[in-house]
Amino acid sequence: MIGLRRGDVRLFEHNKEWKIEGERTVNELRKILGSDAVDIQHIGSTSIKSIKAKPIIDIAVGTDDFNRILSHEAELLKAGYHYRPNHDMGGAQLLFACGSYYEGGDMQTHFIHVVKYNSMEWRNYINFRDYLNTYPEIAKQYENVKTGLVEKLGSRGSRNDYVDGKAEFISRTLRKAMVWSFLGKTVTMDIDRPLGYVHRKSGYKLVYPLNYGYIPGVLLIQLSRRFISQY
């Protein structure tokens, strides 16, 4: 089964059809967008093996230029992808959606999230999926959070309450997933507090025993409601 009536909060057993439809959608978008999409990935709960999910396919499109994606708007619409300009997350994302709801019905089937490639939005989408697929016990914990919320709220419960109820788990897990994504890799860091740097505050001082810095472009996890809703 693919699709859910807009506003419903219902979970279904994992279905192999979701992976097939995700791959089909990725391939279709690649044909339409060509090199204007740096990468396209199936994300969201339907991309996480074995856990229950809303049967809506989420796709992340990574690009270097939103305008180049928008230049394909007519072709995307012809293929059933409706641009939703009121969901641009302050310029950080473009959203396209599929389903009869956008043509007078009530079903939503796909959400296409266009973000800057290698941005925090992109990293979060990919890291959360890969981390839960690598650690099925954590994926099961997440499923338990979701099923508990559905039991509490009911199938026609507040979607906002459902999204808010997942936020703490997703935020905590994303922090772990971000660190995990760098394990075993060589990274370049900007050092802003070198070895021996002295930090003085309120009567005490701290001398840094090592070089302290950050990975450029990697920020503290700040999640939007749109991101949380995909999982």
What are these regions (language model features)?
Residues 174-231:
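Feature detects long, helix-prone N-terminal segments enriched in hydrophobes
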Residues 71-79:
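Short amphipathic alpha-helices in soluble, non-transmembrane regions
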Residues 114, 120-178:
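Catalytic cores of NTP-dependent nucleotidyl/adenyl transfer enzymes across multiple folds
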Residues 1-41, 171, 175-179:
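Helical scaffold of the NTase/Pol beta-like nucleotidyltransferase catalytic core
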Residues 81-118:
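Conserved catalytic core of two-metal-ion nucleotidyltransferases
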